[in-house]
UniProtKB/Swiss-Prot annotation:
Lineage summary: Eukaryota, Metazoa, Ecdysozoa, Arthropoda, Chelicerata
Source species of the chain: Segestria florentina
The keyword Transmembrane appears for this protein: no
Positions of the UniProt region annotated as Keys region for toxin activity: 31-33
Protein family: Belongs to the neurotoxin 16 (SFI) family.
Gene Ontology molecular function terms on file: toxin activity
Domain remark text: The presence of a 'disulfide through disulfide knot' structurally defines this protein as a knottin.
Cysteines joined through disulfide linkages: C3-C19, C10-C22, C18-C42, C24-C40
Protein name: Mu-segestritoxin-Sf1d
Amino acid sequence: KECMVDGTVCYIHNHNDCCGSCLCLNGPIARPWKMMVGNCKCGPKA
């Protein structure tokens, strides 16, 4: 799993799950929102 340089999207290679958390502008630890297959966007800080 990896976080992109802008810190807004997480991606994992198995297509089933969102990654746990990543660094985002809206908080150091953000909850990933389920988006498209294999992609997550960071949501509000949990």
